[in-house]
Structure formats: C-alpha cells, structure tokens
UniProtKB/Swiss-Prot annotation:
Residues 1-10 have a biased composition (Polar residues). The lineage of its organism: Eukaryota, Metazoa, Chordata, Craniata, Vertebrata. InterPro entries: IF_conserved (IPR018039), IF_rod_dom (IPR039008), Intermediate_filament (IPR050405). This is Vimentin A1. Belongs to the intermediate filament family.
C-alpha cells in the first residue's frame, strides 16, 4: 500500500508539475502577448500624436492661407475700385475733350464760311492743347472776345503754335 500511495503521490506530483509548467508557459505566452500589445499601443499612440501635430500644423497653415487669400481679395477689390475710378476719370476727360473738339469744329466751320477761303488740310495734325476764353467787352455786353490758342503737333513734335483773337464770333 505504501508503494501504491507513493506512486499515486508521485503521479499527482508529476501532474501538478506538468500543470504548473503548462500554466507557466501560458503566463509567458500571455506576458509576451501583453508586451506586444503594449508596444503596438505605444506605436499607435505615437502615430496619433504625430497625426495630431501634423493636423495642427496643417490647420494653422490653412488658416494662414485663408488670411492671405482674404488680404489678396481685399487688395484686388481695392485695386479694382482704383482702376474703376481712374477709368471713370478718363471717361470724363474723354467726354470733355469730345465736347471741346465739337466746339472747335463748329468754330472752324463758322470761321471757314465767314472767310470763305479753304483752310489747309488739318487731318495730319493733332491738336494738343487748346484754350477757349470768353471775355466780355466792357463797352458793350453784347460783344464777345474769343481767344483761340492752337498748338499743332506731328508725331509729338510741336510744328506751330498760334494765338488768335476774335471779336464778336457768333
């Protein structure tokens, strides 16, 4: 009986050692798995921090771009308003010059019919500066004096400059 009890005890001891070894291997495997998962977790957390930093930098860069584009848009609007104002000024000058040209054309036609002599061909001349001054005569309020200053140019060069006084031009 004693041998049988010793055999049973040895068998139980062997089974307990085997079970202990199995548990130790399971603990080691689970410890390795936990360590691997911790490494994966740390790697993922590091990637997440890097992505958050990249996102913050991209967000800041995008905000800077938005601010720059808004400034560029405002500058373009200001420049367009300036150009529009300059264009309007040029249109006003053009209208004034058109009126002045029409006035001089009428004056020349009236002078031409009054003198009844043909005028030289002015088609190749440019009138650069003209000035019309109406001066009331002190002696009579019904007579007018007209001063016509004409500068004839060709290709930007002054060819002739003249001033004419006319009394009672109507």
């Amino acid at each position: 009986d004693l041998t049988e009890a010793a055999n049973k005890s040895n068998e139980a001891l062997r089974l307990a050692k085997q079970e202990s070894n199995d548990y130790r291997r399971q603990v080691q495997a689970l410890t390795c798995e936990v360590d691997a998962l911790k490494g994966t977790n740390e790697s993922l957390e590091r990637q997440m921090r890097e992505m958050e930093e990249n996102f913050a930098m991209e967000s800041s860069s995008s905000q800077d771009k938005i601010v720059q584009l808004e400034e560029d848009t405002q500058n373009m609007k200001d420049e367009m308003a300036k150009h529009l104002h300059e264009y309007q000024d040029l249109l006003n000058v053009k209208m004034a010059l058109d009126i002045e040209i029409a006035t001089y054309r009428k004056l020349l036609e009236g002078e031409e019919s009054r003198i009844s002599t043909p005028l030289p061909n002015f088609s190749s001349f440019n009138l650069r500066e003209t000035m019309l001054e109406l001066k009331p005569n002190i002696e009579s309020t019904f007579t007018k004096k007209v001063l016509i200053k004409t500068i004839e140019t060709r290709d930007g060069q002054v060819l002739n400059e003249s001033t004419q006084n006319h009394d009672d031009l109507e």
